[in-house]
Amino acid sequence: MAALRALGGLRGVAAQVLRPGAGVRLPIQPSRGVRQWQPDVEWAQQFGGAVMYPSKETAHWKPPPWNDVEPPKDTIVKNMTLNFGPQHPAAHGVLRLVMELSGEMVRKCDPHIGLLHRGTEKLIEYKTYLQALPYFDRLDYVSMMCNEQAYSLAVEKLLNIRPPPRAQWIRVLFGEITRLLNHIMAVTTHALDLGAMTPFFWLFEEREKMFEFYERVSGARMHAAYIRPGGVHQDLPLGLMDDIYQFSKNFSLRLDELEELLTNNRIWRNRTIDIGVVTAEEALNYGFSGVMLRGSGIQWDLRKTQPYDVYDQVEFDVPVGSRGDCYDRYLCRVEEMRQSLRIIAQCLNKMPPGEIKVDDAKVSPPKRAEMKTSMESLIHHFKLYTEGYQVPPGATYTAIEAPKGEFGVYLVSDGSSRPYRCKIKAPGFAHLASLDKMSKGHMLADVVAIIGTQDIVFGEVDR
């Protein structure tokens, strides 16, 4: 009955509200028989406090299943596995990375090497000491003559000979031209990977000029086989030193243009600063050398600490980084190019006259002019190039400061005309081993910047 009375009261209110001309205001006096009830404070307080009071019924309460049939399961989120390379344009050859990504963040980076393995160290054991030389051009095929220099120094140490001064100055001159070749490739391809195309085209024009110097002195643009045990293959042609001087004078302007484009570029700095940071302690533990070691703040350059050829007679500075990131290593490479120009200028000024091969008929072939008149010279030349020369038994580890780092040759002789063992220590191998450590926690795009700053060539890594 009470419900019916309440319903009747509501009908009366609705009739008054809907009457034409009436406002939306409720009547002040309710209809007869209707009581208006407002919830009092005591009644509202019983619903305050916690949502669920623990009681016998609610103590063992569990939320109902989501779909009333199956209970919810813990979903396992898996990281994505990505194959980077070996045909990736930013992989610099045949690098294959098996990467584990969480979103776009790198959790693991596993380099797979060996795709350019050619068995160089074993092949050298079946060749004479001179025939083994061209294999070294094909190791780090961006800095060719530096590899030849390391091997030649190792053989000379076993033979206990020293090339004449002019040959040593020519070696240093072309060693620094080779350093320019390598650093141009390293910096411009690094920039190209990060989106800056212009430096690549500007500086590769300069690189072609240096290939021309290679060609004029040896006949080959890349695999020169010019620096040989006992000296160099032939003397510098007329006019070459003048052209190298003109080139080195103009090249510093190209470097200024490169730095205008990159050094203070906001995008370049964002992509390289604090990317791939390696502390000095980590760099030593991983066995870094070259720019990778100096970028972390350790001043170690074999041209200064253990000079070979005539590096103790030239003046140059060793640039050192402070943070150990990609930006510091870029700055080190640019400054090394400027120091190489200093060394080239000193080589041109101090180049002495004289012989370019050691005066030892057991090692050096006779002159071409002699071979045209003397049968003995022709036989001597033939025997040297077919049988080779015997090297006294012994072992040596000889290292040079190649553009990428410490390039070492461990050479063992058993007294024959062929090496018993030739172990090649490539700098890029140790650098690639740290790729997992350097890229962990970075974005996928930063891995490209880290590969570029490591300056890896797979001829020397895979051997």
UniProtKB/Swiss-Prot annotation:
Q: What does this protein's record comment on cofactor binding?
A: Binds 1 [4Fe-4S] cluster.
Q: Is Oxidoreductase there in the keyword field? A: yes
Question: Cofactor(s) for this protein?
Answer: [4Fe-4S] cluster
Where N6-acetyllysine occurs, residue numbers? K62
Alphabetized UniProt keyword annotations = 4Fe-4S, Acetylation, Electron transport, Iron, Iron-sulfur, Membrane, Metal-binding, Methylation, Mitochondrion, Mitochondrion inner membrane, NAD, Oxidoreductase, Respiratory chain, Transit peptide, Translocase, Transport, Ubiquinone
Membrane topology designation? Peripheral membrane protein
What is the stated purpose of this protein? Core subunit of the mitochondrial membrane respiratory chain NADH dehydrogenase (Complex I) which catalyzes electron transfer from NADH through the respiratory chain, using ubiquinone as an electron acceptor. Essential for the catalytic activity and assembly of complex I. Redox-sensitive, critical component of the oxygen-sensing pathway in the pulmonary vasculature which plays a key role in acute pulmonary oxygen-sensing and hypoxic pulmonary vasoconstriction. Plays an important role in carotid body sensing of hypoxia.
Q: What is the name of the protein in this document?
A: NADH dehydrogenase [ubiquinone] iron-sulfur protein 2, mitochondrial
What is the species listed in this Swiss-Prot or TrEMBL entry?
Pongo pygmaeus (Bornean orangutan)
